[in-house]
Swiss-Prot record:
Gene3D superfamilies with a match to the protein in the record: Ribonuclease H-like superfamily/Ribonuclease H
Domain remark in the UniProt entry: The C-terminal RNA-binding region of CA is sufficient for all its nucleocapsid-like chaperone activities. Integrase core domain contains the D-x(n)-D-x(35)-E motif, named for the phylogenetically conserved glutamic acid and aspartic acid residues and the invariant 35 amino acid spacing between the second and third acidic residues. Each acidic residue of the D,D(35)E motif is independently essential for the 3'-processing and strand transfer activities of purified integrase protein.
Residues at which Mg(2+) 2 binds: D1361, D1442, D1443
Modification comment: Initially, virus-like particles (VLPs) are composed of the structural unprocessed proteins Gag and Gag-Pol, and also contain the host initiator methionine tRNA (tRNA(i)-Met) which serves as a primer for minus-strand DNA synthesis, and a dimer of genomic Ty RNA. Processing of the polyproteins occurs within the particle and proceeds by an ordered pathway, called maturation.
Regions of compositional bias (Polar residues) in chain numbering: 1-11, 19-39, 49-60, 399-408, 415-435, 915-927, 1009-1034, 1065-1082
Protein name per Swiss-Prot or TrEMBL: Transposon Ty2-LR2 Gag-Pol polyprotein
Reported function: Capsid protein (CA) is the structural component of the virus-like particle (VLP), forming the shell that encapsulates the retrotransposons dimeric RNA genome. The particles are assembled from trimer-clustered units and there are holes in the capsid shells that allow for the diffusion of macromolecules. CA also has nucleocapsid-like chaperone activity, promoting primer tRNA(i)-Met annealing to the multipartite primer-binding site (PBS), dimerization of Ty2 RNA and initiation of reverse transcription. The aspartyl protease (PR) mediates the proteolytic cleavages of the Gag and Gag-Pol polyproteins after assembly of the VLP.
Source organism: Saccharomyces cerevisiae (strain ATCC 204508 / S288c)
Sequence segments annotated as region (RNA-binding): 295-397
Compartments reported by the entry: Cytoplasm; Nucleus
Leftover remarks: Retrotransposons are mobile genetic entities that are able to replicate via an RNA intermediate and a reverse transcription step. In contrast to retroviruses, retrotransposons are non-infectious, lack an envelope and remain intracellular. Ty2 retrotransposons belong to the copia elements (pseudoviridae).
Residue ranges constituting the Integrase catalytic domain according to the UniProt record: 656-831
UniProt catalytic activity: DNA(n) + a 2'-deoxyribonucleoside 5'-triphosphate = DNA(n+1) + diphosphate; Endonucleolytic cleavage to 5'-phosphomonoester
Length: 1598
């Protein structure tokens, strides 16, 4: 039945065989002679398995089907016509059909195309199909061909190994012959003919028989068509058609020759050297490989060769890796010289002392100790590379074991599992890994071994023996494994003891390990030391600790040896020892493979997952776990690298030996931004390790001198106060600590500077935690007290005082107690920010208040006083003259302090400080007494001078006193502090003249109606104290008829302490005078007639104003608003007309008017720190000055107006117009300046879409904007700015990634209309861009220098512009834009691809894009130190965003750059710069007229002519141009080009000078500029110093 199936299906079977052969091939680089049946691919093993059945032809079910290939037909292999091989001398059928041939079956049964004319083959029978597999030859011994009598016995003598053999594939081309030969040789080996295949030398193991020869010949013909053979094969076969073995021999030789190059590369990549062989041998080996590669036209550079050699160095040579790691020019000869040097040194040292370790001359650390009774001490010289290095002997297997085995009982071996240990030294070995089979590790040549001796090794921590003959009490090893210096495993078979019997009958025993995989038997000196035995290498003896000689030691070669005759042999079976621990799992998967397959997960995670069956088809028992826990994956070490872990308390063991104040921790915090210059921006903290005492010092900068002064101070303080010397200071690696100045300071004082390691801030935990604690306290104290931020260091110092006095959770004493100081005196401490009243010991007048409100900060460091902050004076004082305020609420007024009143407690705690003492105030030592621009709100006085010349007269209206509406006033904006300095001092505040104001107008600023209301005489006055906490609006009730007569009787006043004075009787007689003034009076026109009359009321009171000079004598332009006299018309029937206030034009926020409050409490006079303070300098009369009868808690009065008049007279007489005017004028000038600035209307340069297109009534302009709009849209689509394939729903996108967009339209300077689609970067989220990226532009110094060089060298200047530059830069972040509203896509988003204009990162992206293109494609290099300046040998480019300025001696070089740019970018040529005539440029707003080799003129006349009139600033057309060559008489030499910053400033007197080149300029370079002195317009166009601002504003008014 089976034979019938074969007859019916011959082609399918044959095709399957071919599919199986061709579907899987052995790699071509595999050694053909090393291929065995066990190494065949899976299909070979499957084929063998299937064909291991009976010899009968298998059925179709037994043939494995290949589902991946279409089975080819047998006809696909074309048979050669007439057998292309030679016909003469062919084997006869009789020879081919010897008796033994029957055993191999018929030749026609092989899977091959038959040869019709070959006499060596029988014609195939059409009834027999070709089988799938070829029957192999037997393994019987060869029979001679002429032994005809034994034909019948041969088949019985042969034993078959395989029934069928997989045939090779058919040769398809001449180029594949070498690959085909590999498969053919494997086919012959599988056919039991491997011993007759010649090697590359042509040698064979035995002669083949005739039938074997015929078998090889026929199969070679079958699978290698003659016409596809290489030429050299054909030449061999033409000589001898049957010489197949010669073909195979030469093929093998050629394959090995072709693989030599690959072998050389592999050998070079796998170089290893540890000193076991001589350095000369190693150098010859490497040089030979490199030379052989060079002969094959492969040059190996010195750098590559050095890197490959360094990778394989180990042992004492390993440190060379670090030495050459940073070198760029590595020489092979130099590296060989270094290796030879180390090898020679080690050899010399080993000859002198066998226990000495090989070392480099630069790393010798000689230690010499004498032996004692407990431990063995051997004179060693150790090469310390790590802190844990140990003494080692040269060339010996250094072995280290766990401490669990040291000093163990000799009669018992601990069999418990030992955890793995990796020691720090490369030459030490560790235990704890499971044993696994490995080849013997013999890194030492054993030819120097002394037979029957033990090598004495000082570096080995365990004794190792190769023979179990001397091992007593041996137990199998189950878990212990040792690795050698090359990290190779040394399996341990057993653990036992060695018993010694020395000369004098002394017996001892040491632990030993048995392993056959070492070169020498090693005797560990550390094991002998445990038995009090010492090796004396000077007398060559083993001695006891008492000096008794136990045995001699012998020096042989480089080592010392102990004879084995002192060992007591055991009777243990060697076979038993070697077989006690066989590996139970041979076919387990290695753990590194599983580790990589499971994504480099950690060991515990993988093991636990397999236990929980989280991974199918893989069990825990299928993996080799022996080295899993200690396996180090290089990829994991690189990819998962982290900082080392800090163990709590690990630092203490290194510092517990220090005494108090010998070990300090220090760190710097800062800077704190947005502070006045007087406040410190940094602080430096110190902490003592032993006592944890803390110091803080303020710093204004981090310069070396500042840090050095602090260190000098604290070292002197500790030395004098605590009689201690600082030994160590720990700090980080900041430049303020690692500079040479501080290093020299530490060295001179013998202080050890202990730095943290790189990027390891946690190692500096003491100082870092202190800074965090102090800053937490600082924020809390400032927030609770409401004090300004510039007092932040006072809060830090207060926190330091408290922290030093409290006990920390980890200590049983406070820092003060540890330091031997007394505890904190609670009576000397006030809550931070406690309101107090400070005695003013130096008032300006005897009648001025003597108390100043303030806030307590912290106890003084330099006295017994307290540091108190005075908001009114804007400084801190050190004083004991203060009184604590009672019931004063702090900032947190929203809390109920009725139940939290601590007044009684504070009185009890500070009872002895409740009185004023002698005058002992001092200024704060670290400049906190200076005024701050951020401490308070400056005040602005109302200008009574007119701002315009035209005004109209109005009738004088009577006062309206019957209403008091609640209205809003406007608080002033913050201005410079120095402007309001006049109002800060207590002696310059209150007016001496009582006045009456309109009740209605008072709410709007205290305006007083007059008959003629002008901006000068009808000025609006603001009540400064309405808006200040603690101030009052309380005035005398003027609504009753009997009080309108200005009699002012029975007015009650209040003293500072809160007690009421008796009622003062006021004089009711008033003298009302009228004064005529000019609207713009001069100093000399006091009596001239004016266009309006102002009623001046002089109210003479006997009690207050008897000594006050007449008000009429004061011209109004010199009258400060603090002394402004109210203009009141006595006619009560006149109507009330309120004049417009100047403050209406100021951009001030509205504040709701507050009703008058009770001011009986003194504490309410303290200005609240966080409120907007105002005073009378805002332009109105102080409410407290109304009739001088309010319940005044204000600042002190002006002494008298006579002083002001005298100062004015002096001013006028000396005519000092160029100096600073009197302070009484500052506020008027400032208001005028602000008024003038307000009059300048801003000019909008851009339009929105609706303004430019939708509602634009100018049709021509609209059409131009529409054209520009479509042009921008086209450019956006052309550049693929966004993803046009998909719209995104805004609900599906993170709002942080969404940015609004808009179209803006403008008109450029050249008249063209421009449209730009931009992103709203003002609402861009910070997470969507990298804040560190910067958009660089060319510095003006670089541009001016390039222009000057171009002028001197006759360069061509070409100006270019790149259209839509930002759109060429890709965007890395995922961002979406919301289309503009006019597109109607309200709920859709677009995904950005390009850097759209307006994005934060667009400028940086474009800069990186164009920079990369200029460097890579245009062969440019960026000039170091000047960003956006690129240069090559011919062209210099200055880049300003999308504008380029090209400078070149040859115009063709510029054109070449332009051509290259046009390939990538849309480049426009603004000005090519060709020609010799004058060429005009407009570069970044700078107008340049340039004529090569003649002149270059720079200016801004055109742009200034267009811009300045828009700012209402007239342009002086008569400006004179000056010719200034720089500093007169000074010339720059070549040697003076490089100067430091200080010399630069001194030489050019602070001018922004250009960097000039003397050899370029030739002393002929002149700069033309317009000299502008201090101009009034500078107030609006420049940031000015305060004095310059005052001066210019004063000029403006006059």
């Amino acid at each position: 039945m089976e034979s019938q199936q074969l007859h019916q299906n011959p082609h399918s079977l044959h095709g399957s065989a071919y599919a199986s052969v061709t579907s899987k091939e052995v790699p071509s680089n595999q050694d053909p002679l090393a291929v065995s049946a066990s190494n065949l691919p899976e299909f070979d093993r499957d084929s063998t398995k299937v064909n291991s059945q009976e010899e009968t032809t298998p059925g179709t079910s037994a043939v494995p089907e290949n589902h991946h290939h279409v089975s080819p037909q047998p006809a696909s292999v074309p048979p050669p016509q007439n057998g292309q091989y030679q016909q003469h001398g062919m084997m006869t059928p009789n020879k081919a059909m010897a008796s033994n041939w029957a055993h191999y079956q018929q030749p026609s049964m092989m899977t091959c195309s038959h040869y019709q004319t070959s006499p060596a083959y029988y014609q195939p029978d059409p009834h027999y199909p070709l089988p799938q597999y070829i029957p192999p030859l037997s393994t019987s011994s060869p029979d001679p061909i002429d032994s005809q009598d034994q034909h019948s016995e041969v088949p019985q003598a042969k034993t078959k190994v395989r029934n069928n053999v997989l045939p090779p594939h058919t040769l398809t081309s001449e180029e594949n012959f070498s690959t085909w030969v590999k498969f053919y040789i494997r086919f012959l080996k599988n056919s039991n003919l491997g011993d007759i295949i010649p090697n590359d030398q042509g040698e064979i193991k035995r002669q083949m028989t005739y039938e074997e020869h015929a078998y090889i010949y026929n199969t070679f013909q079958a699978f290698a068509p003659f016409h596809l053979l290489p030429t050299w094969v054909k030449q061999i076969l033409e000589i001898n058609y049957s010489d197949i073995l010669t073909v195979l021999c030469k093929s093998v030789s050629k394959m090995q020759t072709n693989n030599q190059e690959l072998k050389d590369w592999i050998a070079l990549a796998n170089l290893e050297y540890n000193g076991s062989t001589s350095a000369d041998t190693f150098e010859i080996t490497v040089s030979t490989i490199i030379q052989r590669l060079k002969e094959n036209n492969i040059n190996v550079s010195d750098r590559l060769a050095c890197q490959l050699i360094l990778k394989g160095l180990s042992g004492d040579f390993k440190y060379l890796r670090n030495q050459y790691r940073t070198k760029t020019n590595m020489k092979l000869s130099q590296l060989f010289a270094e290796i030879q040097l180390i090898y020679d040194e080690n050899k010399i040292m080993n000859l002198n002392k066998p226990s000495q370790y090989k070392q480099h001359s630069e790393y010798k650390n000689v230690s010499r100790t004498s032996p004692n009774t407990t431990n063995t001490k051997v004179t060693t010289r150790n090469y310390h590379r790590t802190n844990s290095s140990k003494p080692r002997a040269a060339k010996a297997h250094n072995i280290a074991t766990s401490s669990k085995f040291s000093r163990v009982n000799n009669d018992h071996i601990n069999e418990s599992t030992v955890s793995s240990q990796y020691l720090s030294d490369d030459n030490e070995l560790s235990l704890g890994q499971q044993q696994k089979e490995s080849k013997p590790t013999r890194t030492i040549d054993s030819n120097d071994e002394l037979p029957d001796h033990l090598l004495i090794d000082s570096g080995a921590s365990q004794t190792l023996v190769r023979s179990a003959h001397y091992l007593h009490h041996a137990t199998p090893n189950s878990e212990i494994n040792i690795v050698d210096a090359q990290k190779q495993d040394i399996p341990i078979n057993a653990i036992g003891n060695l018993h010694f019997n020395f000369q004098n009958g002394t017996k001892t025993s040491i632990k030993a390990l048995h392993t056959p995989n070492i070169a020498y038997d090693l005797l560990s000196l550390s094991e002998l030391a445990n038995q009090n035995i010492t090796a004396c290498f000077t007398r060559n003896t083993l001695e006891r600790s008492d000096g008794t000689v136990l045995a001699p030691i012998v020096k042989h070669g480089d080592f010392y040896w102990l004879s084995k005759k002192y060992l007591i042999p055991s009777h243990i079976s060697k076979l038993t020892i070697n077989n006690v621990n066989k590996s139970k799992s041979v076919n387990k998967y290695p753990y590194p493979l599983i580790h990589r397959m499971l994504g480099h997960a950690n060991f515990r995670s993988i093991q636990k997952s397999l236990k929980k069956n989280a991974v199918t088809y893989l069990k825990e028992s299928d993996i080799e776990w022996s080295n899993a826990s200690t396996y180090q994956c290089p990829d994991c070490l690189i990819g998962k690298s982290t900082k080392h872990r800090h163990v709590k308390g690990s630092r203490l063991k290194y510092q517990e030996s220090y005494e108090p104040f010998q070990y300090l921790h220090t760190d710097i915090f800062g800077p704190v931004h947005h502070l006045p210059k007087s406040a410190p921006s940094y602080f430096i903290s110190f902490t003592d390790e032993k006592t944890r005492f803390q110091w803080v010092y303020p710093l204004h900068d981090r310069r070396e001198e500042s840090i050095l002064n602090v260190f000098t101070s604290i070292l002197a303080f500790i030395k004098n106060q605590f009689n201690a010397r600082v030994l160590v200071i720990q700090m980080d690696r900041g430049s303020e600590y690692t500079n040479k100045t501080l290093h020299k300071f530490f060295t001179n004082r013998g202080i050890t500077a202990c730095y943290t390691t790189t990027a390891d801030s946690r190692a500096h935990g003491v100082a870092e935690r202190l800074n965090r604690t102090l800053l937490n306290d600082c924020r809390t104290l400032l927030h609770c007290s409401g004090l300004p931020n510039h007092l932040w260091f006072s809060a830090v110092e207060f926190s330091t005082i408290i922290r030093n006095s409290l006990v920390s959770p980890k200590n049983d004493k406070s820092a003060r107690q540890h330091a031997g100081l007394a505890g904190l005196d609670i009576t000397t401490i006030l809550p931070f920010g406690q309101p107090v009243i400070v005695n003013n010991h130096n008032p300006d007048s005897k009648i001025h208040p003597r108390g100043i409100p303030g806030y307590a900060l912290h106890p003084s460091r330099n006295s017994y006083g307290y540091i108190i902050y005075l908001p009114s004076l804007k400084k801190t004082v050190d004083t004991t003259n203060y009184v604590i305020l009672q019931n004063k609420q702090t900032k947190l007024d929203q809390f109920d302090y009725d139940t939290l009143t601590f007044d009684d407690d504070l009185n009890r705690l500070t009872a002895h400080n409740q009185s004023f003492i002698e005058q002992n105030e001092t200024e704060q030592s670290y400049d906190q007494n200076k005024e701050s621009d951020h401490d308070y709100q400056s005040e602005i006085e109302i200008n009574s001078d007119p701002l315009v010349n035209d005004f109209s007269s109005q009738s004088i209206n009577p006062l309206q006193l019957d209403k008091e509406p609640v209205q809003k006033v406007r608080a002033p904006k913050e201005v410079d502090a120095d402007i309001s300095e006049y109002n800060i001092l207590p002696s310059t505040i209150r007016s001496r003249t009582p006045h009456i104001i309109n009740k209605e107008s008072t709410e709007m600023g205290g305006t007083v109606e007059s008959d003629t209301t002008s901006p000068r005489h009808s000025s609006t006055f603001t009540a400064r104290n309405q808006n200040r906490p603690g101030s009052t609006n309380e005035m005398i009730d003027l609504t009753s008829q009997d009080r309108v007569n200005y009699g002012l009787e029975n007015i009650k006043t209040t003293r500072l302490g809160g007690t009421e004075e008796p009622y003062i009787q006021r004089n009711s007689d008033t003298n009302i005078k009228y004064r005529t003034t000019n609207s713009t009076p001069s100093i000399d026109d006091r009596s001239s007639n004016s266009e309006s009359t102002t009623p001046i009321i002089s109210i003479e009171t006997k009690a207050v104003c008897d000594n006050t000079p007449s008000i009429d004598t004061d011209p109004p332009e010199y009258r400060s608003s603090d002394h402004a006299t109210p203009n009141i018309m006595p006619d009560k029937s006149s109507k009330n007309v309120t004049a417009d206030s100047i403050l209406d034009d100021l951009p001030l926020p509205d504040l709701t008017h507050k009703s008058p409050t009770d001011t009986s409490d003194v504490s309410k006079d303290i200005p609240h720190i966080h409120s907007r303070q105002t005073n009378s300098s805002l332009g109105g009369m102080d409410d407290s000055n109304v009739l001088t009868t309010t319940k005044s808690k204000k600042r002190s009065l002006e002494d008298n107006e006579t002083e002001i008049e005298v100062s004015r007279d002096t001013w006028n007489n000396k005519n000092m117009r160029s100096l600073e005017p009197p302070r009484s004028k500052k506020r008027i000038n400032l208001i005028a300046a602000i008024k003038g600035v307000k009059s300048i209307k801003p000019v909008r340069t851009t339009l929105r879409y609706d303004e430019a297109i939708t509602y634009n009534k100018d049709n021509k302009e609209k059409d131009r904007y529409v054209e520009a709009y479509h042009k921008e849209i086209s450019q956006l689509l052309k550049m693929n700015t966004w993803d046009t394939n998909k719209y995104y729903d805004r609900n599906d996108i993170d709002p942080k990634k969404v940015i609004n967009s808009m179209f803006i339209f403008n008109k450029k300077r050249d008249g063209t209309h421009k449209a730009r689609f931009v992103a709203r970067s003002d609402i861009q989220h910070p997470d969507t861009y990298d804040s560190d990226m910067q958009s660089n532009t060319v510095h003006h110094y670089a541009l001016m220098t390039s222009l000057s060089i171009a002028l001197d060298n006759d360069y061509y200047i070409t100006q270019l512009d790149i259209s839509s530059a930002y759109l060429y830069a890709d965007i890395k972040e995922e961002l979406y834009i919301r289309p503009p509203p006019h597109l109607g896509l309200n709920d859709k988003l677009l995904r950005l691809r390009k850097s759209l204009y307006g994005l934060k990162q667009s400028g940086a992206n474009w800069y990186e894009t164009i920079k990369s293109y200029l460097i890579n494609c245009c062969d440019m290099q960026e000039v170091r130190g000047w960003s956006c300046v690129f240069k090559n040998s011919q062209v210099t480019i200055c880049l300003f965003v999308d504008d380029m300025i090209l400078f070149s001696k040859d115009l063709n070089a510029n054109k070449k750059i332009i051509t290259t740019l046009k390939k990538q970018y849309d480049t426009k040529i603004i000005n090519l710069g060709e020609g010799d005539n004058e060429i005009q440029y407009d570069i970044l707003g700078l107008e340049i007229k340039y004529q090569r080799s003649k002149y270059m003129k720079l200016g801004m006349e055109k742009s200034l002519t267009e811009k300045l009139p828009k700012l209402n600033v007239p342009l002086n057309p008569k400006g004179k141009k000056l010719r200034a060559p720089g500093q007169p008489g000074h010339y720059i030499d070549q040697d003076e080009l490089e100067i430091n910053e200080e010399k630069f400033r001194n030489r050019f007197f602070g001018t922004k000078a250009m960097r000039l080149r003397d050899e370029v300029s030739g002393n002929n370079l002149y700069v033309y500029y317009i000299e502008t002195k201090k101009n009034i317009a500078d107030v609006m166009t420049k940031p000015l110093p305060i004095k310059t601002f005052k001066l210019l504003t004063n000029k403006w008014i006059h």
